[in-house]
């Protein structure tokens, strides 16, 4: 599984530092959401984002890429790092069987 990390998530976390992660900021920091969507669909990438526009687009689409939307508010970087360390394996397990999830600070919510 390959994850496409949107520009609104920090790319320097150790959890993201291997070949399963592609960073939008390394492709084009100005990449439009529609282009990111197409890239994910064409390559079977999972979008990692904090942007609710992807949820809104998924609601109106017949086909959409797998999407994980992080809804944990404004965490400090060390708290965000801890969040990913504690929850990443569960997030991956859930997205394998689903299309769109909200990752809240204290729960994971399956949307589709």
Show where each model-derived region lies.
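Hydrophobic/aromatic beta-strand patches that form the interior of the parallel beta-sheet core
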Residues: 22, 48, 68-70, 101-102
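Charged phosphate-binding loop/patch that engages nucleotide di/tri-phosphates or the phosphate backbone
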Residues: 90-112
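Acidic, metal-binding active-site segment of PIN/NYN-like and related structure-specific nucleases
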Residues: 44-58
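Residues at secondary-structure transition points
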Residues: 30-35, 52, 75, 79
């Amino acid at each position: 599984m390959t994850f496409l990390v949107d520009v609104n998530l920090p790319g320097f976390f150790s959890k993201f530092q291997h070949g399963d992660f592609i960073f939008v900021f390394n492709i084009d920091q100005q990449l439009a959401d529609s282009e990111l969507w197409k890239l994910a669909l064409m390559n079977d990438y999972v979008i990692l984002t904090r942007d609710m526009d992807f949820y809104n687009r998924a609601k109106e689409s017949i086909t959409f890429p797998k999407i994980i939307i992080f809804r944990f508010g404004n965490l400090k970087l060390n708290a965000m790092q801890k969040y990913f360390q504690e929850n990443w394996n569960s997030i991956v397990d859930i997205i394998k069987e689903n299309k769109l999830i909200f990752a809240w600070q204290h729960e994971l919510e399956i949307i589709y």
